[in-house]
């Protein structure tokens, strides 16, 4: 350099990138030798300055970032909020995990970005800062772990551990953080060891594929090129792609040529291209070279070492293999501290440019509601959405890209920098996604419910795997489980109350039944109505009865079992219908079957004179409308008795009429209720015949007199059958409105008396003021037998009195005297119903019995199911305090040895030292997969809690007054939701006192002295739909967990947490935690409403699990799940760790052409379409050739992009031509297909594409083939040299095959010459090689003909070709190519 030149003195920090640029400029200007001399001087200068500075590195140089404290605190706050939402059931586990990762990843990234400015401002000459940011040693992420935070770690499987390490290595780690850090560090160490060997093996395989690729020619004469457009890629990548390449075509600007074909591209030419914005530029690449087993200089381009065209004889294949493999080795060794640290991508956000109101087109075709990846409600854009933000003085227009989430509502006010949309992650990041299954396990045992429909997955039709069609909650209702393994049936039934330890005693009972059966009160009766002997019985059933009869003080009635097992009693939840047939019915078989319906109340409690069952006699049924009459008016006697009213399962008496006479009369008539708008085709008081049209769609069933009346709801049209009589002066008939003349009261010999032998009903009709006539209507007489034969309906055992139990029979006319009866849609009307009333005397045994508890007991034996009705007299402990702890009370299982379970858990024996909540509960029988051993679930007090009281004087007074007004209104018992636990005995007592209130709580429980404090509570009033209105939303909530203590909430605790709304609580409703039931108190737990009272609700605690569509639910509805069982499985996408140790397997997958999850089928379909159309247009020889060409070009570009993506994401720059040489080898084969059989090649034989083309031209016939991708390993074993193949793998097999086939090795590559010790045909050894073949000179015509045709097809129709090819070149398409597995 001349010393006299005025040198510029730039004051800039020179980093690694600047040094690279400087060196390349120096080489361009001064050449290699002078540049190396300059660089030696730079090196010496650097060492001198470093020695003079004497930088040392100490622990004090690690400066923690000041903003770290509040950043971490903010992230913790978000994590806590997220945990709450997950607990409430607002987000599911995957959304929580995903958001947690992104919160901590964003915090860690922000700290990393803060690090450099912090060093620059506080300490620019910090040794750590100088070392890492100059690129000498360590990078930003490594220093970030020293002074920022260590962040999220990966476990050895590459999965993320969701507990972040908040400390950095300068501060030191806590014990937990250290253990998590060890996971990641272990992964880093293992990766360094394992992946290094992997990288080395990858390099060996790559070199094996391309070791024979040598530059042996200057120009192959190809006319093809690949288009590169500056508009389709970033400028930096465009420059990297073009520099060092050779143009395949002339470049024009207008009519002026600025570059010619076969000219190599330097930096000046690239800048000119960028300046002039040239249209797509066609360049030569290794893909376009027409040489079979080598490459020409122009297709390769410049040598990266000296910046000129590559020399002949250069081993570019080995250089390419080393260039790709070596960075992997280097990067695995360069892990430093970052081993195992998780890196992922966060979503991009669109922010509002200013304050204002946001507006967009709210159209269902454009946006629809959805959930974001974090479970937040949002609007999903299906296509580009234009958004306008109106501020005071300016309008901002934004475009939201498709598949983005809009986080604001239409016309909402947004603030500046507020996030208004989230762009779908993955469109702009290089991180790999993988589909992962996430199993969610139950953390408590309980019963499974779901709040939506599910359907079977097609592959699991007969199992318990279901798919969710929409977002919903899964609920695990709490309850302790106990499995009965001892016997195939259990004595416990649904809703029984039990002690959990009693199941053990049950097994002892079953095994040690005493043989002394005489002491057991036991009877067994014939299972049919016919008079069989009592001895004719099944031994299996007697054994069953014995077991059940061992329970003291219980009445057990066997149900009626027919000889035909098809007519077993139909059992519903709380109802048993016993089929009944009289002997007459058996003979005639005309009357339809009827049955005795035994219906138990929901809680199973009967008070005195309650209705146990009813029987509808088919003789008292009619199918027509009409009027009932008891004799002539005033002539019948009626005795007032206690009638009945049906409430929610409790039937009790109220004053009604009970018949004491032996017959009643029914006057039939036909009634039609028509709407007001209908047109009536008959007149009032006219006579019609049978099947006369009376309205548009209505015809009469009987003839007679028509009466038309207008009513509120429409038009009532009555048809009275009978005869019309015009009375003369001699007829003495009373002018009352209607008279019933019983049979036998008229004139004996008259025609009318013979005609109306059943009696007549006389009715006076006055159509006009003057005329009148009398209508004689026929009457149906019903005779009532003298009492019902009980033996015909029940077994004899049921008719006998036991323990002062009585069964009374009452016939009850359903309709009152003279009341009209209307039929409803062809259903039969029951006129008389027979009631069976349960009663008992106030004898010695049952003096204090206020109620009876009834339940159905189902016993299975020998494949038959038998239902028993069990009735227990319940003794009220309040009315008889001396017998409160009497062990002989009515329990499920009791003996003298073990302690006894009373009906009410709060009156246990003083000896019991455990608290009642652990010992007592209501039993629930649940579905189990093993049908022989049913599972039992015990619902005890610890699984439920009470919320209340909701105190408001006004609303309570209103309800009290309404109860006073109508004394009939009973307190309704709680109805169960969806077949779940209908009643919890601990709260819903078995006792009904005079006030109809109940014992709720024992205030004190002492072992020596048992004291009870009772609180009288009332219920809500419920309407028919089962909904309950909460009258006071402003009151407090008290949580009573039934562990004998109260929890009070202060009145002003939640002042503004809930709005003033009236909450409607319905039974069976699921309530999420933190929902509002009262103004100043949210729900304290999630659960299901079991009981609703006036001032409180009882909720069975439950755990909600949110599940989104496509999740897989394990288990059936109502099934017991144990702790640790799988509840639901999610399928979701997650980012892989972005470490090169994770990237290398990805490169290997692509190069070995193994199938990857993300490969799509789009390209494959497109290629098939091309093949079809091109073959149809051009005929077979050209069709296969061009179809295979297009497929191979597409797959090559896609492969190059995939491999570059991995390395660029790590900051590693590899020139495209190295990758192209490798990819060219693995895509150079085609597969001969079977449909076009050729004499030359075998079906499914692998041949080179160029060989296939030449053979086709020579034979002038079509060879059918398709493109095929080989992995690098299979390519190494499919070369022309068997010596090279044998030196790589499977030596014995390869040599044996080669010997048998008589293969010849032409020793063209490096490896085979090394093996046999010959001269390597590279470098100086290349000059002695003859590379001109006579064969090429012998067919010049065919060659020119073929090339001309290709040029015409591919370049004169350039629009088609360029649009297909250039679109995919050097961008990052998601779609890939069809791959063929090695197998």
UniProtKB/Swiss-Prot annotation:
Molecular function per GO: DNA binding; DNA-directed RNA polymerase activity; zinc ion binding
Keyword Nucleotidyltransferase found: yes
Cofactor binding note: Binds 1 Zn(2+) ion per subunit.
Catalytic activity: RNA(n) + a ribonucleoside 5'-triphosphate = RNA(n+1) + diphosphate
InterPro entries registered for this protein in UniProt: DNA-dir_RpoC2_beta_pp, RNA_pol_beta''_euk, RNA_pol_Rpb1_3_sf, RNA_pol_Rpb1_4, RNA_pol_Rpb1_5, Rpb1_funnel_sf
GO cellular component, as recorded: chloroplast; DNA-directed RNA polymerase complex; mitochondrion
Function: DNA-dependent RNA polymerase catalyzes the transcription of DNA into RNA using the four ribonucleoside triphosphates as substrates.
UniProt protein name: DNA-directed RNA polymerase subunit beta''
Gene responsible for this protein: rpoC2
């Amino acid at each position: 350099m001349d010393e006299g030149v005025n040198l510029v003195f730039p004051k800039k920090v020179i980093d690694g990138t600047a040094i690279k640029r400087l060196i390349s400029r120096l080489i361009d200007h001064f050449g290699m030798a002078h540049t190396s001399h300059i660089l030696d001087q730079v090196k010496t200068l650097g060492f001198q300055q470093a020695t003079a500075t004497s930088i040392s590195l100490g622990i004090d140089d690690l400066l923690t970032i000041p903003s770290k404290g509040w950043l971490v605190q903010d992230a913790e706050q978000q994590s806590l909020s997220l945990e709450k939402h997950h607990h409430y059931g607002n987000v599911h586990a995957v959304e929580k995990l995903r958001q947690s990762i992104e919160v901590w990843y964003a915090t860690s990234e922000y700290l990393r970005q803060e690090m450099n400015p912090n060093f620059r401002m506080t300490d620019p000459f910090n040794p750590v800062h100088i070392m890492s940011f100059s690129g000498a040693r360590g990078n930003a992420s490594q220093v970030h772990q020293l002074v920022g935070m260590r962040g999220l770690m990966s476990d050895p499987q590459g999965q993320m551990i969701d507990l972040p390490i908040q400390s950095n290595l300068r501060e030191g780690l806590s014990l937990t953080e250290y253990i998590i850090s060890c996971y990641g560090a272990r992964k880093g160490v293992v990766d360094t060891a394992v992946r290094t060997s992997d990288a080395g093996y990858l390099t060996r395989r790559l070199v094996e594929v391309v070791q024979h690729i040598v530059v042996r020619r200057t120009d192959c004469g190809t006319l093809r090129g690949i288009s590169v457009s500056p508009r389709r890629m970033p400028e930096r990548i465009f420059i990297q792609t073009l520099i060092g390449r050779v143009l395949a075509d002339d470049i024009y600007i207008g009519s002026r040529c600025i570059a010619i074909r076969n000219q190599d591209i330097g930096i000046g030419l690239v800048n000119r291209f960028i300046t002039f914005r040239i249209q797509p530029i066609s360049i030569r690449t290794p893909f376009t070279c027409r040489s079979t087993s080598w490459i020409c200089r122009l297709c390769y381009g410049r040598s990266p070492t000296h910046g000129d065209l590559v020399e002949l004889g250069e081993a570019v294949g080995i250089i390419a293999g080393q260039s790709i493999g070596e960075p992997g080795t280097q990067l695995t060794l360069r892990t430093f501290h970052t081993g195992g640290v998780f890196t992922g991508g966060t979503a991009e956000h669109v922010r509002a440019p200013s304050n204002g109101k946001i507006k967009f087109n709210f159209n269902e075709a454009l946006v629809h509601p959805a959930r974001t990846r974090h479970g937040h409600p949002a609007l999903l854009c299906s296509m580009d959405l234009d958004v306008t933000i109106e501020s005071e003085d300016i309008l901002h227009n934004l475009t939201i890209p498709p598949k983005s989430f809009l986080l604001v509502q239409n016309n909402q006010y947004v603030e500046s920098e507020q996030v208004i949309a989230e762009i779908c992650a993955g469109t702009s990041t290089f991180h790999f996604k993988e589909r992962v299954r996430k199993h969610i396990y139950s953390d408590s045992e309980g019963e499974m419910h779901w709040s939506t429909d599910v359907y079977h997955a097609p592959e699991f039709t007969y199992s318990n795997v279901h798919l969710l069609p929409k977002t919903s909650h899964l609920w695990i209702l709490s309850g302790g489980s106990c499995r009965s393994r001892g016997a195939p049936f259990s004595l416990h039934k649904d809703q029984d109350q039990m002690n959990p330890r009693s199941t053990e005693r049950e097994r002892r009972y079953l095994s040690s039944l005493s043989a002394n059966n005489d002491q057991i009160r036991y009877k067994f009766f014939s299972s049919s109505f016919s008079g069989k002997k009592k001895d004719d019985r099944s031994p299996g059933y007697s054994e069953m009865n014995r077991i059940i009869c061992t329970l003291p003080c219980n009445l057990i009635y066997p149900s009626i079992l027919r000889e035909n097992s098809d007519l077993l009693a139909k059992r519903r939840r709380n109802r048993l219908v016993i089929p009944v047939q009289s002997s007459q019915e058996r003979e005639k078989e005309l009357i339809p079957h009827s049955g005795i319906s035994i219906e138990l109340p929901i809680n199973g409690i009967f008070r005195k004179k309650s209705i146990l069952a009813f029987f509808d006699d088919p003789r008292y049924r009619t199918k027509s409308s009409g009027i009932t009459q008891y004799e002539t008016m005033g002539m019948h006697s009626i005795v007032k008795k206690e009638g009945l009213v049906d409430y929610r399962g409790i039937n009790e008496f109220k004053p009604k009429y009970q018949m004491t006479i032996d017959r009643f009369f029914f006057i039939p008539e036909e009634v039609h209720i028509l709407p007001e708008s209908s047109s009536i085709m008959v007149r009032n008081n006219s006579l019609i015949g049978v099947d006369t049209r009376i309205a548009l769609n209505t015809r009469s069933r009987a003839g007679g007199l028509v009466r038309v009346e207008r009513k509120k709801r429409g038009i009532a049209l009555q048809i009275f059958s009978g005869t019309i009589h015009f009375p003369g002066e001699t007829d003495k008939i009373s002018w009352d409105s209607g008279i019933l003349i019983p049979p036998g009261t008229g004139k004996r010999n008259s025609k009318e008396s013979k005609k109306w032998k059943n009696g007549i009903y006389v009715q006076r009709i006055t159509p006009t003021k003057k005329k009148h006539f009398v209508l004689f209507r026929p009457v149906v007489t019903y005779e009532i037998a003298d009492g019902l034969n009980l033996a015909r309906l029940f077994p004899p055992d049921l008719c006998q009195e036991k323990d002062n139990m009585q069964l009374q029979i009452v016939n009850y006319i359903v309709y009152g005297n003279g009341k009209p009866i209307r039929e409803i849609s062809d259903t039969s009307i029951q006129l008389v119903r027979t009631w069976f009333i349960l009663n008992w005397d106030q004898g010695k045994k049952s003096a204090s019995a206020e109620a009876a508890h009834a339940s159905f007991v189902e016993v299975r034996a020998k494949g038959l199911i038998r239902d028993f009705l069990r009735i227990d007299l319940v003794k009220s402990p309040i009315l008889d305090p001396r017998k409160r702890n009497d062990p002989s009370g009515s329990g499920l299982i009791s003996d003298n040895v073990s302690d006894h379970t009373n009906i009410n858990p709060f009156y246990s024996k003083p000896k019991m030292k455990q608290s009642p909540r652990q010992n007592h509960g209501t039993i629930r029988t649940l579905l189990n997969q093993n049908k022989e051993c049913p599972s039992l679930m015990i619902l005890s007090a610890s699984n439920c809690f009470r919320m209340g009281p909701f105190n408001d004087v006004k609303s309570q007074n209103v309800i009290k007054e309404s109860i006073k007004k109508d004394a009939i209104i009973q307190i309704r018992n709680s109805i169960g939701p969806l077949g779940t636990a209908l009643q919890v005995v601990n709260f819903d007592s078995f006792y009904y006192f005079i006030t109809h209130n109940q014992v709720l709580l024992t205030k004190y429980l002492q072992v020596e002295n048992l004291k009870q404090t009772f609180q009288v509570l009332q219920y809500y009033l419920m309407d028919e739909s089962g909904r309950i209105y909460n009258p006071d939303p402003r009151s407090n909530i008290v949580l009573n967990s039934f562990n004998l203590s109260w929890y009070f909430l202060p009145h002003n605790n939640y002042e503004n947490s809930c709005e003033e709304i009236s909450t409607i609580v319905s039974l069976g409703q699921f309530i999420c935690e933190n929902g509002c039931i009262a103004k100043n108190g949210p729900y304290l737990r999630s659960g299901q409403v079991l009981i609703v009272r006036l001032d409180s609700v009882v909720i069975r605690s439950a755990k909600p699990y949110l599940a989104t569509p496509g999740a897989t639910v394990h288990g059936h509805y109502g099934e017991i799940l144990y702790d640790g069982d799988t509840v639901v499985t999610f399928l979701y996408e997650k980012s892989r760790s972005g470490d090169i140790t994770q990237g290398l397997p990805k490169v290997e997958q692509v190069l070995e052409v193994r199938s990857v999850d993300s490969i799509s089928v789009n390209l494959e379909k497109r290629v098939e379409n091309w093949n079809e159309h091109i073959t149809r247009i051009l005929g077979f020889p050209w069709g296969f050739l061009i179809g295979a060409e297009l497929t191979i070009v597409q797959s090559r570009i896609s492969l190059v992009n995939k491999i570059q993506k991995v390395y660029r994401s790590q900051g590693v720059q590899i020139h495209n031509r190295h990758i192209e040489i490798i990819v060219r080898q693995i895509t150079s084969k085609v597969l001969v297909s079977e449909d076009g059989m050729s004499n030359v090649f075998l079906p499914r034989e692998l041949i080179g594409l160029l060989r296939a083309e030449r053979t086709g031209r020579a034979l002038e016939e079509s060879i059918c083939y398709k493109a095929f991708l080989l992995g690098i390993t299979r390519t190494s074993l499919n070369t022309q040299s068997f010596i090279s193949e044998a030196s790589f793998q499977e030596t014995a097999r390869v040599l044996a095959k080669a010997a048998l086939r008589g293969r010849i090795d032409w020793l063209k590559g490096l490896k085979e010459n090394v093996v046999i010790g010959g001269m390597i045909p590279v470098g100086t050894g290349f000059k002695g090689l003859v590379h001109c073949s006579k064969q090429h000179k012998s067919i010049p015509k065919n060659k020119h003909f073929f090339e001309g045709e290709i040029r015409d097809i591919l370049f004169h129709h350039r629009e088609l070709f360029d649009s297909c090819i250039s679109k995919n070149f050097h961008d990052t398409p998601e779609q890939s190519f069809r791959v063929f597995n090695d197998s």
